[in-house]
């Protein structure tokens, strides 16, 4: 949908974003703010949509919003979002404890890359339904309290965290929450046949050509507002000489966009 200025939505623009998120758990907007490097775009947009609890991860900027661009000092420490490498399917904050679950996030594109940097997105509710309809035991396995463990991060003192064990699917105030990563390193799945089968089936959904997967490449001034949907990012190539070095603002929240 078109918006005049994400920092100052009209009532009808805000209502439409909420409405679409209520249907699909995600909404994509376009604005005239191509190339405008102002993190208030993400901050004010979130506030107007009722997102009040910004969650700053250790690598976020001082104001709690992350500037996702190729950053050597962060990429050297192994943090893929700050490289031009592909990001595998995941939900944000899958390594967080339950009290810090990421309910929503905003991505706002200041500048695209010269090539690449596409996102694919899938509503977790659709993923749940596909798994349930294929075999209810898949959902049962992924809802177990010990379905997935993210080992402790003890290598980087600035982003140290303990191991986190929990379900893939959980409910929070009547809404579905999903924590997932397609990474095969730094993750431990519950060692039983049901969990392995469920993870394999979900992997096939994400690797296939599902009509439920939405694909887009954000242009300058465009953005995504969503209730922490599954997403990935393809590798990309920057060309600073032509001004095409990818910069995306990311704001994460522990609350969700609700259809008021």
Feature-to-residue mapping (PLM):
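Active-site environment of non-heme Fe oxygenases that use a 2-His-1-carboxylate facial triad
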Residues: 1-8, 20, 61-217, 223, ...
